[in-house]
Curated annotation (Swiss-Prot):
Cofactor note: Binds 1 zinc ion per subunit.
Protein family: Belongs to the GTP cyclohydrolase II family.
One record GO biological process: riboflavin biosynthetic process
EC code(s) of this entry: 3.5.4.25
First-level EC class: hydrolase
Membrane-spanning ranges: none
Annotated protein name in UniProt: GTP cyclohydrolase-2
Oligomer and partners: Homodimer.
Residue sites binding Zn(2+) per the record: 54, 65, 67
Function: Catalyzes the conversion of GTP to 2,5-diamino-6-ribosylamino-4(3H)-pyrimidinone 5'-phosphate (DARP), formate and pyrophosphate.
Length: 199
């Protein structure tokens, strides 16, 4: 296992009381967290959101993406479900880092789309490693989930990592004039899906 469970505490939020669990990667020291709501033990699939870090969307309420909207909606859905997990996957800017994400924004301001901007900076369209999230689920002893995502790459990688996904639950929120091109590019170039998936 590439990471370990380090610490946990109660985390009261606008949506209810979660348990926040901190994880640390063994070789890099990078940290990730999971927010757990309710009882996630048992054989029923657990509603799960893997949310990649987005400082601009999550904390600064940027309209350039749908990340902040997705974060709030996911927390609401999990509490409505009475049980669930949100993994906060700390790979900012599809894992190119915050400063490179700002550089990518500047390229987008000059006409590039989100994929072209990454490539202009020498990165793949998506540099994230979702196997870390599979390891977190295994440390939480969760093997069967319903995943809140529009991203088929997450489904594919988690399935390959022996996480049983029984349903893909779309999370389609936050479209606005500032991010409509970004969302269209995610669909056309990154393969994001906007319909539900049942196994």
């Amino acid at each position: 296992m590439r990471l370990r469970r380090v610490t946990e505490a109660r985390l009261p939020t606008l949506w209810g009381n979660f348990l926040i669990v901190g994880f640390e990667e063994n070789f890099t020291g990078h940290n990730h967290i999971a927010l757990i709501y309710g009882n996630i033990t048992g054989s029923d699939p657990v509603l799960t959101r893997i949310h990649s870090e987005c400082l601009t969307g999550d904390a600064l309420f940027s309209s350039r993406c749908d990340c902040g909207f997705q974060l709030k909606t996911a927390l609401h859905c999990i509490t409505e479900e009475k049980r669930g997990i949100l993994i906060y996957h700390r790979q900012e800017g599809r894992n190119i880092g915050l400063l490179n994400k700002i550089r990518a924004y500047a390229l987008q301001d000059n006409g590039a789309d989100t994929v072209e901007a990454n490539q202009c900076l020498g990165f793949a369209p998506d540099e994230r490693d979702f196997t870390i999230c599979a390891d977190i689920l295994k440390l939480l002893r969760v093997k069967k989930i319903r995943i809140l995502t529009n991203n088929p790459k997450k489904v594919e990688i988690l399935n390959k990592s022996c996480i049983n996904i029984t349903e893909r639950v779309p999370l389609i929120v936050g479209r606005n004039p500032e991010n409509s091109r970004y969302l269209d590019t995610k669909a056309s170039k990154l393969g994001h899906l906007f319909y539900s998936y049942h196994k």
